[in-house]
Amino acid sequence: MRRLRNRSLWMTLPAAGVLFMGLAARTTAATPAPAAPARTRTALFNMYCYWTGEATLGRVPGVVKTRIGELSGEVVEVEYDPAQTDVGKMAAALKRQGGFYAFLADNPIAKAEGKRYLADSEIKEIERRPRFIESKYNLRTSHPDLAALDLSEQQAIALNSWSYFGGPMPDVLTAEQKEKLGKIKERLAAKGGNR
């Protein structure tokens, strides 16, 4: 099956059979979710668009959880493995997207890490927590069929980033999830749906 480079063309095709055929054609097993790191840290970033920030940070190796919310603007909270990434690498990814405003520190460790990695960026101390809202917007709105699959946090992060940036769908679904997705697609196709 030839890969489609034009995302708008992909979205116009009746996905009921196309996506299922692509999943069924794969013979490799899904990549197992990595074991949760023994120790994680949390970082909070203020930005212009939390949906973009969440999708961007979801592509950074070592990010294990993302949440979006509001605290005098839009924020993304990231739980990450400090053995794989740091605040500087995550901020660099956000700066490449053009959406990073400030690093928010709510404890002495976060403040020290911000000063260590982000000398040229604004670091704001906060006294209250953000009001968090439902995450993974791109996955939920562009691919509700995938969002309905009891995804692990790691699967949801990977698929949400893919939903935003496009490209080949990451092979993160288990065989059971692929089977369930196929049944969802068949039901939708029978009803005349294109999702």
Where are these regions (language model features)?
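N-terminal secretory signal peptides that target proteins for export/translocation
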Residues: 1-5
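Flexible coil/turn and secondary-structure edge motifs
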Residues: 22-195
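N-terminal leader/presequence-like segments
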Residues: 8-10, 57
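Bacterial N-terminal signal peptides
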Residues: 11-22
